[in-house]
């Protein structure tokens, strides 16, 4: 399902990227209305040149990362016509997870038309559901995607709204087993499936510096108490949990999604911490959902102790501050011991890209009249 450029123009002219046209989901939406609606608000959907933050970053790389590194030189040796396209070649490293529609159309080494359906598609339904194998857990898009799904049902290529489309959808609903085998193999329910794009490295051939880790949710999860693999953790859930348990929880399906069980589907919002994307498109509902997700008992912060400086080199430790409630005198030097515990984040906090994500603890001291005396971490 590739939308025409004419349908994309209103959004592109208004906000700079496509919001209303659900590129690549037209056929799926006929049976999976709830899932498509959820996906349409997700960070997965806005992963490519329809993400202004990613677009600026990848374009900078394509225009300025011009050094002919060893890996790129070997690439150019096979394709000498790309001698002047080193930045574009390096951007292919990112495209397997951010721009599969552009990559599979063979456009990553070309000048990309950001107004094209491929550039505005993001991660479509088939970007995930056409994957038939994960080679290993090294990440960086190390998956195998089928060349073309052969739809086993009659009138597979019928146009939306036609009698053929109605017969096709009726056949799927009557005998969905073949469709389910194609679109939902067992490994889709594992964290290893997610590792293919949520474990990222940047090798020397890309950054002309050295290998370093860009993101690694998978190994952090694998070695955590949530995966029941950490003997020294202070937190063990009753049962092992995988990525999908937190990021694809059950959600009501009021639009009649045929895959719903007891009125619920696995959410395709993929909620995490990204509030910037919904903010730039004015999606207050998604921002509220993310805030609720993050405030659902994920972390615990305790002001564990107070160190009062008595004389030089000596101090007094005050524990159980909630019970003792010590008062402080003007000019007194104190140190607070604060303990932060990760209770319900299945990987390290904060997660995501290593170079840009930080967490703040807001710590405020008030006087007896609620006047602010000191603040740290206030945003």
Positions of PLM-derived features:
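Hydrophobic alpha-helical transmembrane segments
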Residues: 87-96
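Near-N-terminal "mature-domain entry" segment
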Residues: 28-31
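An acidic-aromatic substrate-binding cleft motif
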Residues: 21-25
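Conserved, well-structured interaction surfaces
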Residues: 96, 100-108
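Primarily the internal scaffold of c-type cytochrome electron-transfer domains
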Residues: 1-19, 35-82, 107-379
């Amino acid at each position: 399902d590739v939308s025409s450029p004419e349908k994309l123009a209103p959004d592109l002219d208004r906000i700079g990227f496509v919001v209303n046209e659900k590129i690549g989901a037209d056929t799926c939406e006929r049976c999976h209305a709830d899932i498509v609606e959820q996906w349409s608000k997700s960070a997965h959907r806005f992963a490519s040149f329809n993400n202004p933050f990613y677009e600026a970053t990848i374009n900078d790389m394509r225009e300025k990362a011009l050094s002919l590194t060893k890996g790129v030189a070997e690439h150019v040796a096979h394709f000498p016509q790309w001698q002047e396209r080193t930045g574009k070649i390096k951007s292919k490293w990112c495209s397997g997870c951010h721009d599969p529609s552009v990559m599979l159309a063979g456009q990553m080494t070309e000048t990309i038309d950001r107004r094209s359906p491929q550039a505005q598609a993001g991660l479509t339904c088939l970007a995930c559901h056409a994957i038939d194998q994960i080679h290993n857990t090294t990440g960086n898009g190390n998956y195998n995607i089928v060349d073309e799904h052969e739809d086993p049902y009659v009138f597979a290529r019928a146009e939306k709204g036609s009698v053929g489309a109605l017969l096709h959808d009726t056949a799927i609903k009557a005998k969905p087993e073949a469709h389910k085998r194609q679109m939902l193999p067992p490994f889709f329910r594992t964290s290893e499936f997610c590792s293919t794009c949520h474990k990222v490295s940047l090798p020397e051939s890309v950054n002309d510096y050295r290998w370093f880790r860009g993101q690694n949710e998978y190994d952090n999860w694998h070695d955590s108490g949530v995966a029941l693999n950490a003997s020294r953790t202070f937190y063990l859930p009753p049962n092992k949990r995988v990525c999908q348990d937190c990021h694809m929880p059950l959600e009501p399906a009021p639009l009649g999604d045929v895959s719903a069980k007891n009125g619920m589907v696995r959410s395709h919002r993929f909620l995490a911490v990204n509030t910037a994307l919904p903010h730039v498109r004015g999606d207050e509902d998604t921002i509220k959902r993310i805030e609720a997700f993050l405030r659902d008992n994920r972390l615990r912060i305790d002001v564990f102790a107070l160190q009062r400086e008595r004389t030089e080199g000596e101090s007094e430790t005050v524990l159980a501050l909630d019970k003792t409630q010590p008062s402080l005198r003007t000019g007194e030097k104190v140190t607070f011991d604060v303990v932060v515990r990760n209770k319900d984040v299945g990987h390290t906090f904060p997660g995501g890209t290593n170079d840009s994500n930080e967490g703040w603890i807001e710590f405020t001291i008030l006087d007896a009249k609620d006047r602010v005396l000191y603040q740290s971490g206030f945003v």
